[in-house]
Regions:
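Short, function-defining helix-loop hinge/capping sites that tune catalysis or transport
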Residues: 17, 104, 153, 157-159, ...
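C-terminal alpha-helix
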Residues: 54, 58, 182-194
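Serine-dependent carboxylesterase/thioesterase catalytic core
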Residues: 2-16, 20, 24-35, 42-135, ...
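Conserved loop-alpha-helix segment in the C-terminal half of the alpha/beta-hydrolase fold
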Residues: 26, 143-161
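Catalytic histidine neighborhood in serine/cysteine hydrolases
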Residues: 158-174
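Acidic catalytic loop of the alpha/beta-hydrolase fold
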Residues: 14, 142-148, 171
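Post-His helix in hydrolase/transferase enzymes
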Residues: 48, 174-187
Length: 196
């Protein structure tokens, strides 16, 4: 079985939204997993703990470190888990995720604050998401995103190990076959570089 990959959906989305991405990863030889949390709506300490438990379960059952791919809000989970559990994470990949800079430089922050009991500036975790986690990281971003400002999804050079610009809109980043081909290619390149 290939490298396990935990795929975390964006805000107001669930595992169905990442079905094509996971199917493509499986076809490419990876071992993908959905997050199994229903729709990604509220960020709470309990939700974070459950996703952390999901990561630990996958790492334990496969005996391998896990690649985490997070789309939009899911990417914040990916980076958070990479900070908290680096011993379980092989690579953290963000797809159009607003992890850097102004947390209001996107078209979803007002909705996020309506759905949650905290502001975008005071999330329910102490980790600084913009700081590079102690594991390899890839940020995928787009100037055509339309939801998240490119500079917030790209981040500063010292906030990720690699940054890839994709010419797609926000809702295509994890569902377009062309975007998925780039994601799968980046994962294959990482796996090749990881080999001794």
């Amino acid at each position: 079985m290939g490298r396990p990959v935990l795929v975390i959906p964006g805000m107001l989305s669930g595992d169905r939204s990442t079905a094509l991405l996971r199917a493509s990863l499986r076809q490419a030889g990876f071992d993908p997993y959905g997050w199994q949390e229903g729709f990604n709506v509220r960020v709470t300490t309990q939700a974070i703990a459950r996703v952390e438990g999901r990561l630990a379960d996958i790492a334990t059952s496969t005996g391998r470190k896990v690649v985490i791919i997070g789309w939009s809000l899911g990417g914040l989970y990916a980076r958070l888990l990479a900070h908290r559990r680096p011993e379980l994470v092989a690579l953290a990949v963000t797809l159009g995720s607003p992890f850097s800079g102004n947390r209001r430089a996107n078209n979803a922050w007002r909705l996020y604050e309506r759905l949650n009991d905290h502001t975008v500036d005071a999330p329910p975790f102490p980790e600084e998401i913009s700081a590079k986690p102690p594991v390899p990281t890839i940020a995928m971003w787009s100037t055509k995103d339309g939801i998240v400002a490119a500079e917030c999804a790209r981040g500063a050079p010292d906030e990720s190990d690699a940054r890839f610009e994709l010419p797609y809109r926000h809702f295509e980043l994890g569902s377009s076959r062309r975007a998925i081909a780039v994601i799968v290619g980046a994962l294959h390149n990482f796996m090749e570089e990881e080999r001794p």
